[in-house]
Structures are given as structure tokens and as C-alpha cells.
């Protein structure tokens, strides 16, 4: 049974069609990266999966159960899906520790001592234990994103969705966040990563999806999609990316 399955998903904003009949599945423990130009529908797809956007048509199933039909509460969704956003979305008036423990205590009814113990373990995992009492304003963008990842993990979700987690970061801070995500990938966490970091997607993914104009144009193992794409649109996109990341992108491992 797939960890995540999307069937015939369609989404429009007024007359603008954003997602056109999207179907995909992600297996337990699989890491899938979603690449493509800006405006291709990648972020909207993630928001529809975790029900931040209502879909117009189609189905979204997590571990075989539909979550698009209104029968599941936000608490149910939080138990299944964790989402990491571009802008961190940390509460500015709360400490790092409070940001991580708030949802487990309020939504999952986890006793505060247990929530704090779990938070300390996660902060150690993402290299932020020394900042547990800091406010977000005292942290760099990379540090805020690592806290956001720990916060998502604190809910013990079945799958993590990353919506361009490094796009708002200073280039010098990107590596520290990618290192944390790569570590999670190595633990068998099921993940869908929307990213413009092509080399990272090539290295960490089991499978890569290329999206354009609201549809999935091509998908496959990174060793195939990056080195021998079948579709002309995929080839054009990757050729343009070569100017940024160089020949390393298309070299076979």
C-alpha cells in the first residue's frame, strides 16, 4: 500500500488551471523530489495533499485512506503529514522549545514533560540544542528552517512534505538545511521534496518528478532522468539548469 497516492487531482484558481489531472504514488520509505520551473504547480500540489487547499476534483489517499472528502479532522491530517514551508512559519513570540512542543501538547495531548523530552532529542538531531531558548528573531534563516523541520517531526508524521525549504535562504545557509534533510532520507522517512536544488535531488532521491504547466511531464530514477531525459521539455529545463549547476548534474554516478 502506498504511503501517499494522488488520483486525477485537478485544481484551479478562478479561470487559472493550476493542476491538470495529477496522479502519483509514493511508497513507504521512498524519497521523491519534485522539480520544475516556477509556476508549474509544485507548491499547490503539496498544499492540496496536506489539505491547505481544497481540490476541485480527484482523490488524495494517505496509507489507503482518503483525506480529501472532509471526513478527517486537522488532527488526523497532522498525524499523517508534516509540511515544511519556504518561510519557516515559526511563531515569533515563542522560543524554539515552545515552537516545537506547542502542537504535540495541544493537538495530540502529549504531556508537557514528554513533549519537551522529544523536542530536546529532535533539536539535538538537527544541531540546534544550544538554541532551545532562543526566539526565531535571534536565529539565522538556516537555523529557523532546521527548527521548522524539528517541529514537523515532533508530530511523528508518516510522511514529510518539503515545499522548497531552501528557496528563502542565503546561499551560504542552504547546505546546513540540505544536510538535515539528507540525514532524514537515510533513516527511511517517507518524503516528497519540492526543490530547485538539482544536485541535491539527484543525490538524495529514489525518484524524481518533473512538472510543467500543471502536469507531470516525466518521472524516473535520478540516474535516468538527469542523464537521459526522454521528454523534450525535461531536456530543455535541465539544459537551462546546467548554466547554474554545471556538468555534474548530468554525469552518471
Annotate each language-model stretch with its function.
Residues 212, 223-253:
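C-terminal boundary and immediately downstream tail of ABC-type ATPase nucleotide-binding domains
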Residues 1-10, 245-253:
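ABC-family P-loop ATPase nucleotide-binding domain
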Residues 2-222:
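ABC family nucleotide-binding domain
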Amino acid at each position: 500500500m502506498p504511503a501517499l497516492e494522488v488520483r486525477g487531482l485537478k485544481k484551479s484558481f478562478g479561470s487559472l488551471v493550476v493542476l491538470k489531472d495529477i496522479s502519483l504514488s509514493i511508497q513507504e520509505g521512498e524519497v521523491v523530489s519534485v522539480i520544475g520551473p516556477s509556476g508549474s504547480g509544485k507548491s499547490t500540489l503539496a498544499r492540496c495533499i496536506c489539505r491547505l487547499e481544497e481540490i476541485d476534483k480527484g482523490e488524495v489517499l494517505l496509507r489507503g485512506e482518503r483525506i480529501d472528502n472532509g471526513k478527517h479532522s486537522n488532527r488526523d491530517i497532522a498525524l499523517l503529514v508534516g509540511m515544511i514551508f519556504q518561510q519557516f512559519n515559526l511563531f515569533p513570540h515563542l522560543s524554539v522549545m515552545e515552537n516545537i512542543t506547542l502542537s504535540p501538547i495541544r493537538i495530540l495531548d502529549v504531556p508537557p514533560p514528554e513533549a519537551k523530552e522529544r523536542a530536546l532529542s529532535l533539536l539535538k538531531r538537527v544541531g540546534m540544542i544550544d538554541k532551545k531558548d532562543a526566539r526565531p528573531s535571534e536565529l539565522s534563516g538556516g537555523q529557523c528552517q532546521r527548527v521548522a523541520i524539528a517541529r514537523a517531526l515532533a508530530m511523528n508524521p508518516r510522511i514529510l512534505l518539503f515545499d522548497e525549504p531552501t528557496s528563502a535562504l542565503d546561499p551560504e545557509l542552504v547546505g546546513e538545511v540540505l544536510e538535515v534533510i539528507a540525514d532524514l532520507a537515510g533513516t527511511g522517512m517517507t518524503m516528497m521534496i519540492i526543490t530547485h536544488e538539482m544536485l541535491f535531488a539527484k543525490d538524495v532521491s529514489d525518484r524524481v518528478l518533473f512538472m510543467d504547466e500543471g502536469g507531470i511531464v516525466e518521472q524516473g530514477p535520478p540516474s535516468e532522468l538527469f542523464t537521459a531525459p526522454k521528454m523534450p521539455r525535461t531536456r530543455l529545463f535541465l539544459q537551462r539548469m546546467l548554466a547554474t549547476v554545471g556538468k555534474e548534474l548530468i554525469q552518471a554516478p
